[in-house]
Amino acid sequence: MTPRYIFRDPPLSYRIFRGLAYAVGVFIILTIIAALLLRFVPPITSGVMIERYIESQTGDLPFSKNRSKKQNYEPHYHWVPLSKIAPIMGVAVVTSEDQEFADHFGFDWEAIDKAIEYNQTHRHTRGASTISQQTAKNLFLWDGRSWIRKGLEAYFTVLIETCWSKERILEVYLNIIEFGDGIYGVESAAQHFFNKPAAQLSNDEAALLAAVLPNPHVYRADNPSAYVIERQTWILNNMHRIGGTEYIKKL
């Protein structure tokens, strides 16, 4: 007599685990493909641009409090290659945001340790995000401080550090970073604030734009506060520390 075999469905926990593993695998494959594609192709939008559009439809934009709900939100975003951005602009943002940019693999652990120590004893928190982290966050993610978002930011940071050159990371950063209400990238910022292309930015103008980057929701390039002017002066006085425009040529 032929024995009968009864095949039972695997336990629910196993099916859930298998489904999650499959989803994670698909996510990793798709994000690697996206990163490899964006190594050569300019992004048509970014996570932050999409987030700001959604906020504009709910009246929750972090900029003007005088806007009405479902405002006419018109993002200004114009991609230009790094060769059409004044080299001093790259020097200014590296001086301001991430002086170890050329040497780290996405994370400045010394700056992170200092920020943790500072935040334990001060009311206002200090960040330690590198240019690579900011690029990953602005391109692929959204604003927020949850552990899930921070974990995704770390993943995408490692991904672009692996797939892109430092030059490409800086190029994407300068093109998608937020400089003000609906103003994305240094070309749009140069045209909006100085009525000139990014290729013609002066040292003072580049330093001013870099000075608002810690928080473009609060600091303005068209009406700089005393803090922004002080920050601009500090950037101008410290750009030589990383080697000036020669720094960009070595990336």
Language model segments and positions:
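Juxtamembrane regions of bacterial inner-membrane/periplasmic proteins
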Residues: T2-L251
